[in-house]
Amino acid sequence: MVAEKRLMRPAEVPAPIDYVELQRLTRYFDVNGRWIRWPTKFSHQDPCLWVLWSRLPPRQIFSEREINELLRANHLFDDPALLRREMTDRGMVRRTLDGRVYKRVERRPTLTALTLIRLLSGNL
């Protein structure tokens, strides 16, 4: 019965991609895909964080030092603590209470974030 109800609902259509906004988001990254500066707009922070999330190997456990190294390799404003905290607060990364162990949370990024990830990786 639950499956039947689900089938009867109209399919959810994702919001169209705002290509002007996507172009603005690419300005936060250099030609090598490294994040240059922290966005002041909250709506720009999330897609940029998804880019870093996509570069964390899935199903692996990282020490604080290891995740810092991965983050530093992918951003140029040298604030891995900010990035760790934001990714944890937004449910992209989980960490132990003592902050020693981190793991990427497997979730589907937003359509804008997915498009940005593909664009920066050269897959668009």
Where are each of the predicted segments found?
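A short, conserved structural fragment
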Residues: 89-99
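Minor-groove-contacting beta-hairpin "wing" of winged helix-turn-helix DNA-binding domains
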Residues: 100-105
